[in-house]
């Protein structure tokens, strides 16, 4: 079985048991307590804790992508040096929210590993909690009692946290053989590799209170997890996950890039790279970006660790981005968004590689120099300098030292890091904007925050208070043809914030204003000069024409929010937005996709409000007063004591610092272009208005005319319907041709024998036709419908074989059962992966019967 087959087999198996198959949730969870989704149950956490109601149906199955590379669950240091640690992995799981419990969960698990995966029963062992007599007794109906081991809380009790849902768990182990693993730790419960855990079944049956007391849950739940990487290696007869088809194609690519063959014993660097490129590719494809903190910093650490291992292999130029194609080839079939994001992911990786490779040589030189003075502990000061100056994450330095049997003074490193953070915090207390690099503190102390006048004025005379280079360092002047940042005493340019893009425009006769952003309370404009600028210059500023279109889209976003609450429900809450001159994007909390009818109602309501018109009203008031007045505020947003409230008649009222139209009739028209999901419980609407909507309508008309021309019809809809009918007819002919080919037969003792799998048609009709055409006939047909249901039927005419026994024999190979009369019988099956085996065995069964 290849990895894709295992993934599909698992999901299909549990779908056949009534589970709803759900897609993998994002790697960045909607959970402030976690850096990344690190287990299959994370997307369902709020269901297990009772924060949200049980879904329908209350049983689910998934193949969840996971990252463990930060926080409590951090496997980064071990990756590459063990057979099974990974930063990125896929977790197969089935979940029951108060529906079935231990009996069914254990039965499903045993059936899947023994009948679908076909793992030898004499290689399997299980563990249960020492107090879980119920699980022990259930398991004893499937496996010999001497193969069931009891362990305590450390091994067989699971809980989310200090309080909340928890319960005993049961693990399934695979014996890799004493002939391969015979260290003192290779026993059940030991740390050796002989007995390998492949599946963990968690029985959430208790609620733990703050005092540690366990109380039975009224509706116990099931949470299971099986690592795809582990089970793939086992099925392929490999003792290391990295030797399986999930990783070897990547390792082979690394070997090509470095020009050195891979040898397992000395191949840690190959394994690190093959693991890390999966994490980096998936995180970037899902929208995480390289950063100096948080998830973005973990992403950077993973990539830089891989780059350093490439350096060890002699690769001293960007190479990780070249591996993205292979990741997409291996995994893009199931995770199709990888293919869509491939080009952007490669570009981001290459840029990050170039940045680090520019400093890695100097950093390694410092490392080697300091190493000469190190006996056992590498100094924290040197480690901090490697981090602060050369971009070496601490765990990368620790990784290099571990290879030499040394350690780093982490305590001193942490002290220096804390001191740096304290200095930054003191300098920027109350700021909360962007990064702390650059000469912002000096500007704040000298000038304070500059004034934004762009609500009232789109043109103004201003004075240049400061000029900064691209690194935000103070400079006296900016030559013609250069880019830099300008601080004006007063500015009409809106700085990017609240989802609205920053203004562009011009310094009349001097420069183009490309963008405007806010840094620690300072409104700074990025400019490209056509004439020299210097500090103290008196200049004329003019906001670009994009501002008007941006304002229309921002006001339309407020109307969209109000319409969603009116049509879909008041539970709708903004989860993010992006407003530009030619489009808007609005993310909102909602558990499912909007229907076509809901989308139309929302769009119609917004346009109705636009036609009717309503004046904009802005007020500055106390935060609590604003909330009491009914103004909508973002739940996670931090507001000042005084806030700006924007309202449009009785239609909309929100806390907002952005720019808007004076009357909503200025928006013109509004059109929703897309509704999609962002993550569990978050939906996204993309839309256009004003000129962008007009341009879209024109493009639709042009496409319609092109379609008419292509179809040679003035009524393209009717032409398409006609084409669909013709295509259906051709498909039917193709299916019939396939069936005709499939029904080729053998001659056995003057009996026409046919055993086949067919794509379409009525099985009974085909069998009757076959029997009518031949004096002596024996036919068995297998068919799988669109939902994966397997149907079998057998027919016999004037031949020494019984249809009932024959079809039952075939069905049992497919994990099902059936029977019937001697001349005609039917059955059902479950395991589509065994169809070829069923056909071969059924032919042999019939041969033996007919040749007697």
UniProtKB/Swiss-Prot annotation:
EC number(s) on file: 6.1.1.7
Gene3D superfamilies, alphabetized: 2.40.30.130, 3.10.310.40, 3.30.54.20, Bira Bifunctional Protein, Domain 2, Threonyl-trna Synthetase, Chain A, domain 2
GO MF annotation terms: alanine-tRNA ligase activity; aminoacyl-tRNA deacylase activity; ATP binding; tRNA binding; zinc ion binding
Subcellular location: Cytoplasm
Keywords annotated in UniProt: Aminoacyl-tRNA synthetase, ATP-binding, Cytoplasm, Ligase, Metal-binding, Nucleotide-binding, Protein biosynthesis, RNA-binding, tRNA-binding, Zinc
Amino acids binding Zn(2+): 554, 558, 656, 660
UniProt xrefs under PROSITE patterns: AA_TRNA_LIGASE_II_ALA
Entries under InterPro entries matching the protein: aa-tRNA-synth_II/BPL/LPL, Ala-tRNA-lgiase_IIc, Ala-tRNA-ligase_IIc_anticod-bd, Ala-tRNA-synth_IIc_core, Ala-tRNA-synth_IIc_N, Ala-tRNA_ligase, Ala_tRNA_ligase_euk/bac, DHHA1_dom
Cofactor(s) it depends on: Zn(2+)
SMART domains with a match to the protein in the record: tRNA_SAD
Cofactor comment text: Binds 1 zinc ion per subunit.
Enzyme class: ligase
ATP-binding keyword on record: yes
Family: Belongs to the class-II aminoacyl-tRNA synthetase family.
Domain notes: Consists of three domains; the N-terminal catalytic domain, the editing domain and the C-terminal C-Ala domain. The editing domain removes incorrectly charged amino acids, while the C-Ala domain, along with tRNA(Ala), serves as a bridge to cooperatively bring together the editing and aminoacylation centers thus stimulating deacylation of misacylated tRNAs.
Protein name, as recorded: Alanine--tRNA ligase
Species of provenance: Campylobacter concisus (strain 13826)
